[in-house]
Amino acid sequence: MRELFATKTCPYCIEVREQLEWDALDFIEYDVEVDGAARARLRELVGANPMVPVLVEEGRVSQVGVSGRGCYVGNG
């Protein structure tokens, strides 16, 4: 199962979410702005200063940001 770590307002997250939906791919989305456990897992996956969107496939990070761009997640 694909997992998308994102925020509702990040334009890069919106782009990845819309592409996954357009491609009719199943995924679970975690909003790291409101879900502390998801934010902690995101940090485990990509480090202390994570950038979203992060796409995880089969337990492995397959994408961070979009073409090197993304939105940084605060300490929340």
Tell me the role of every PLM-derived stretch.
Residues P11, V34, S62:
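Glycine-/small-residue-rich active-site loops that bind phosphorylated ligands and cofactors
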Residues E57-G76:
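Non-catalytic, surface beta->alpha helical segment in thiol-disulfide oxidoreductase systems
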